[in-house]
Amino acid sequence: MTSTKKDPVLAVLQLSGGNDALNTIIPYADPLYADNRPSVRVSEDQVLKIDDHIGFNPALGPIKDLFDQGKVAIILGVGYPNPNRSHFRSMDIWHTCEPEKVGNEGWLGRAIRDLDPRGENVLTGVNFGRGLPRSLAAPGVPVASVGNLETYGVLTGIDDDQRDEALDIFSRMYSPAIGRGQVMDYLSHTGMDALKGADILSTAPEKYSSTVEYGNNSVAQYMRNIAQTHIAEFGTRFLYTTAPYNSFDTHAGQMVGHSALWGEVSAAVRDFQADLIENNAADNMTLLVFTEFGRRVHDNGSGTDHGSGGIAFVVGENVKGGVYGEYPSLEESKLLEGDLHFNNDFRGLYSTVLEKWIGIDAKSVVGGEFEQMAFL
């Protein structure tokens, strides 16, 4: 647990599409890497080396700098038993911690309910992006979902008198009426939570000042929004965003596309950390970066297809930086139908963050007891 008096906060950056683990943290010293990747590989002279065996893709230079400062944990071989190679199903498993069945509650939704069982803070969980990720969804749990924090709010762009009158109408419309039943009570409660959350969040930009210049892309701007919300101290404990939908699904043109994506993501992570430090807000923030699966070991000529074992990152001032877990073997006999085997269950990763950082019992959130790691 953090020593700061402020509550610990978790930010999550989801890399949708299935990030290629082999070309992210590269086993450059293993001849089987070059053998399996005749067209889609990073040459050894470009690798940002960690040790005599593995290193970063050069596009992750900003994250490598943070790693060298001891602020990044690399989690190798992350996955789950009997992997599913469907984007939708695999992401659903990561979101709900339910590999054997379709779950209806997200792991962070359950965590929010544990932290705030009466829903007293409508901003305990906030998502930046379109829709609401299933990871944050749970019955009766209020979560704000924001497309653009700079323009977020209720009825922005009209004068105060008109806005107050309209909000009064909305308030009465959402107020529960006698005899409406449980469904309408829930909807009216949710509607009022949305109004409250929008009003509070709309003040975040005015509370924010920074010299950090984020990139002109959606990941960078959402990470900036996360920083703004965290710095505003609304009592938010979980902040979430997603890289552009399925952008990491690199079936073709991977050498250019994958590097460009990581260039944006790694710069955004660096700027996020710098922003928090400048605003004295880094000590109670940890960032988790994950993807739903890795890619096939052998390339397809221009890209890579859906695989299994992947890589995750945990970033922050309180992180015990380093490499955690073993790199899955590239030997053909040790592959899982041509994919990397997982050796770290993602629910152990979640459990580590929930118990050692957030400070809640993870078993009911992730659906059991899983081996935790030492990065916190």
Question: Each PLM stretch: what is its role?
Answer:
Residues 269, 275-301, 306:
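Metal-dependent active-site segment of extracytoplasmic phospho-/sulfohydrolases and closely related
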Residues 1-279, 311, 315-376:
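Feature for exported/extracytoplasmic and membrane-associated proteins, marking the mature portion
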